[in-house]
Amino acid sequence: MSKLVISTSIFQSQVADLLPCNNHQKSQLTYSLINAYDLLQHFDEVLTFPYARKDDLLEFHSKSYIDYLINGRFNKMMAQDVNNPMVESKWSELSELADNWNEKIDYNPSQDLQRFTTRENLYNYYLNHSQALENNMDCINNSEVPTNDKPTDTYILNSETKQYNLEGDCPIFSYLPMYCQVITGATLNLLDHLSPTERLIGINWDGGRHHAFKQRASGFCYINDVVLLIQRLRKAKLNKITYVDFDLHHGDGVEKAFQYSKQIQTISVHLYEPGFFPGTGSLSDSRKDKNVVNIPLKHGCDDNYLELIASKIVNPLIERHEPEALIIECGGDGLLGDRFNEWQLTIRGLSRIIINIMKSYPRAHIFLLGGGGYNDLLMSRFYTYLTWCVTKQFSNLRCGDNNSFQIDPFDVCDGDDSEQFIREHDLVEMYNEENYQYWIYEMEGSSRMKMLRNDNKDRDMVELMKFYEL
């Protein structure tokens, strides 16, 4: 039996969508769709207000970096947002859409299901419902800008922004400290339910920030929650841990943190081509006598090829390590329909691979984290379907005679995907241009399904197997 725990809520999703690359919507779309399919009722615990203290972040990151990153002067509206009212309007767009839906169906959501219409309201809720002020005064109020001052970027135009790479794809954005502490907490708080007598399966689709380094941000990642999770697991006396990364990009931050550890195995399956971020993760970077495993793939990888990679290389290497805990980074930027347009995995295919790995290690604690994915509507479908797969396979609450679980929403008769539409819910109109079809990116004949040339060959797999002595 497994205990299923997920960290998700309207609050968490709106905080997650402060991240610029989330386009004010990625996490909220996912949360709403998971709710539309009634999946949260299958979990033993749903964490709704995650939080990580400053000391938690310091278990991996340097003090100078954390002191700067979560300083209270950034827990406010930055000047670039104050001077651009369109940004706030865009941020509140989903709230307005949800309100219109609720009014249409005459539904009055409870307070915990109401969205925050401004980021300032979101932050006030954060202050009122956390112990941040009490336990972490230094990171909330240190160098706080007086409230009657106009927001200004003067504070951030200095050498430290360059030193910590807080520019380019990792800019300082409004309420950055709140974002870092909530989203990191969403991963770490899963461990509150760790027990030596029961297998834990924990999920945080807003986590998996695998590019962040000890002293700098990188690739949209500010705090490396994966590394912090592994450190916590080690403190809990779980010594042998495996990290598997299916993101399109190499999991460089996690790999570097544990590159000399004999107890921590890192496996990254990623695109490796000249000029592709982050430029690391070649086969030569791996160390056969250590636990650094890189599986560099080429353009066009599909379900069949990745399933072979998983069965012939990934699983045997995990078995060799015999982990007590397994962390899987479930990035979706390799899916058909993602803006990178590099791989052609399907939602069903990638989910099947992940579930098969989970089933192969019934005694290991398992943590599923999010990752890349730059088609927000596609990602909401992926994480909703994968969540359903996890509950279908592992939820204790689905066992026995429970009438509420009689119908599985993704069981399609005769394989006819064309008749399966997104369920009605508060954000369903976001899927209007895709005709509300759930599988539009995988349907034969769909204008959204664009097949790619697969440059990965059987000989490449043979080379990988030979390198890892399989």
From Swiss-Prot:
The keyword Transport does not apply. Residues 47-392 are annotated as: Histone deacetylase. Its EC number is 3.5.1.98. InterPro entries: HDAC_PDAC, His_deacetylse, His_deacetylse_dom, His_deacetylse_dom_sf, Ureohydrolase_dom_sf. Keywords: Chromatin regulator, Hydrolase, Nucleus, Phosphoprotein, Repressor, Transcription, Transcription regulation. It catalyses: N(6)-acetyl-L-lysyl-[histone] + H2O = L-lysyl-[histone] + acetate. One of its GO terms (biological process) is positive regulation of transcription by RNA polymerase II. GO terms for molecular function: histone deacetylase activity; histone deacetylase activity, hydrolytic mechanism; protein lysine deacetylase activity. It comes from the Eukaryota. GO terms for cellular component: histone deacetylase complex. The active site is at 211. The modification Phosphoserine is found at residue 110. It is found in: Nucleus. Pfam families: Hist_deacetyl. It is an enzyme of class 3 (hydrolase). Belongs to the histone deacetylase family. HD type 1 subfamily. Present with 538 molecules/cell in log phase SD medium. Responsible for the deacetylation of lysine residues on the N-terminal part of the core histones (H2A, H2B, H3 and H4). Histone deacetylation plays an important role in transcriptional regulation, cell cycle progression and developmental events. Histone deacetylases act via the formation of large multiprotein complexes. This is Histone deacetylase HOS1. The gene is HOS1.
